[in-house]
Amino acid sequence: NGYLLIDVDQQEKKIEIERIHLEEDTAKQLHFDTYTLLDYNRCGVPLIEIVTKPNIRSGKEAAAYVEQLKNTLLYLDVSDCKMEDGSLRCDVNVSIRPYGQKEYGTKVEIKNLNSISNVEKAIDYEVKRQKALFLKNQTIDMETRRFDEQSKTTVLMRKKTSAVDYKYFTEDNIVPIQLDVNWVHQVITNLPELPHQKMIRYQKEYGLSNYDARVLTSNKELAHYFEATIAHYSNYKLIANWLMVETLGYVNKNNILLKNIKMKPQDLAKLVQLIDEGKISSKQAKNVFEQLMQKEQSVEEIIQKMNIVQINDSNQINEWIQQVLQEFPASVSDYQAGKDRAFGFM
């Protein structure tokens, strides 16, 4: 009765889980144009296979499910989930059927998809391929295919001989394990807040949009940084914007990990507070932000060094204006005569 909730186009959907079982890894396949290499370095490494029920209806939903599963595993410290390294992989089964038909069509398996984007692309292509065969009254064979990243198509690996053709062997030295229901409930009760739960809380508690909450919770470290920052200042929306735009932009541009940045949560909170109070402009704040990212220092130290505090005292500002007008009477006359460039000069 397990499931994960996904969010696609702001619509929530429950993806049910059929079962979870343990396996041993065999080898990593490296496919080339005319041959395939096998890397046996991870042979015998234990892995968890999580099988969903067939209620995923598109490549987009499948990608959202893998993303949610990945985030859940990361939140629970189960795995680093690096798809490019093979620590998280995805096989998909694709079938089509006419509207109104209850029985599923012939299932085609696509093996070892190594990125979330490829999951979506492979499914979308395979659906089109099967539709084309169906409309031509051609047979859709039960087979195993792989996704070719160059051509963005699925390529035949082998034909299947039966509906159950998994090529696996049971481990006779390990008896079946029956998990106690009370133990399962205890584990569930003690789980930390999971990404989907956190996303809903961010919307309700902090008034964030669905998009903002989804981005912030898509990365465990980002969510922790956000919560550490709002503990010091409570403009949730502005802090979220600075994290999603400026911080993630800097991290991606410089190819660094979020956990390795120099800026501390309390410094970002102080920066946002100064913007709110009108003591520095957004442009000035970006300059301070760059300095915070490059070296461990406080906001106050940077502002003092850069001498960029914004003056909001209207009496002081009026006094300076009068000084400028008195110092440049010719420019005042030019502006009054319609020469706008004089204003820029002053």
Protein language model features and the residues they cover:
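Structural motif corresponding to the C-terminal cap of alpha-helices
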Residues: L73, D77, V251, L325-V332
